[in-house]
């Protein structure tokens, strides 16, 4: 499945912002994979923290090959050593095993999370060991399909904003301005900012001072794309 959006969302954003309009028209529609199964999505995002998308995919595929469908019963029964054998750290294996146990015991109600507002869902998800605000926001976007997620904690979003709008830095106040401008379709804006940060428009450059760029690598919370997702774009009139 892909994150669902269409003309309504893009036309709204294009009317709100000339530079984003240019970016949307240049890149075309973006297909971004989603995982509607909240349980497996949480696991996938925990695995992907602070590692490359390639490494995450390798670990994830090993788990799928071993277990088939990931359920709380299967993961809880596997135990930490078995989870580690797929290539993840002890800490991540501990988080994942604990999460599965909490779901089984009813401590974490996934159905309730799906029905919550964005704010309440983020608050609840960050109460789970191993999940911070950035991870919770990515789960809302790429599992629950929430339409208005723009993450200040994602350094690639900040990079995309710098590149598109020629800023040297993105302060919280400046970020809130863009968050308000793109609402209620911040998630769609995120897709295009990630694409810009990943080099979809070659002539765009990062305006951050060189010392800042050298000090920040593109990893979790700073990814060119969220590590658990595959994104491709298609345009009726591609430009080079």
Question: What do the PLM-derived regions correspond to, one by one?
Answer:
Residues 41-46, 78-82, 120-124, 156-160, ...:
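A general alpha-helix detector
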Residues 46, 79, 83, 107, ...:
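Short amphipathic alpha-helical interaction patches enriched in hydrophobic/aromatic residues
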Residues 19-23, 51-52, 56-129, 181-183:
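Alpha-helical ds-nucleic-acid-binding substructure associated with the helix-hairpin-helix region
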Residues 28-33, 40-43, 76, 109-114, ...:
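Generic, ordered loop/turn and secondary-structure boundary motif
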Residues 1-3, 36-39, 73-75, 114-117, ...:
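Short acidic alpha-helix initiation/capping motifs at coil-to-helix transition points
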Residues 8, 15-68:
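A positional/architectural concept
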Residues 1-30, 94, 133-240:
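C-terminal accessory module of base-excision DNA glycosylases/AP lyases that mediates lesion recognition
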């Amino acid at each position: 499945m892909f994150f669902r959006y269409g003309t309504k969302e893009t036309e709204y954003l294009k009317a709100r912002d000339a530079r984003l309009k240019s970016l949307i028209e240049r890149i075309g529609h973006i297909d971004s994979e989603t995982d509607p199964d909240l349980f497996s999505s949480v696991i996938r995002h925990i695995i992907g923290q602070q590692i490359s998308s390639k490494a995450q995919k390798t670990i994830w595929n090993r788990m799928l090959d071993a277990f088939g469908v990931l359920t709380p019963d299967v993961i809880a029964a596997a135990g930490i050593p078995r989870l580690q054998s797929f290539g993840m750290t002890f800490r991540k294996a501990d988080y994942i095993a604990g999460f599965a146990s909490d779901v089984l015991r009813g401590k974490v109600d996934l159905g309730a999370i799906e029905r919550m507002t964005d704010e309440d869902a983020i608050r609840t998800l960050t109460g789970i060991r191993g999940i911070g605000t950035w991870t919770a926001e990515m789960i809302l976007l790429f599992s629950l399909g929430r339409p208005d997620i723009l993450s200040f904690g994602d350094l690639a979003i900040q990079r995309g904003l710098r590149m598109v709008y020629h800023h040297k830095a993105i302060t919280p106040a400046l970020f809130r301005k863009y968050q308000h401008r793109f609402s209620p379709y911040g998630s769609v804006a995120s897709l295009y900012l990630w694409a810009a940060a990943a080099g979809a428009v070659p002539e765009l450059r990062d305006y951050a001072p060189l010392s800042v760029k050298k000090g920040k690598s593109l990893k979790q919370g700073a990814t060119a794309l969220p590590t658990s997702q595959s994104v491709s774009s298609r345009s009726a009139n591609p430009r080079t």
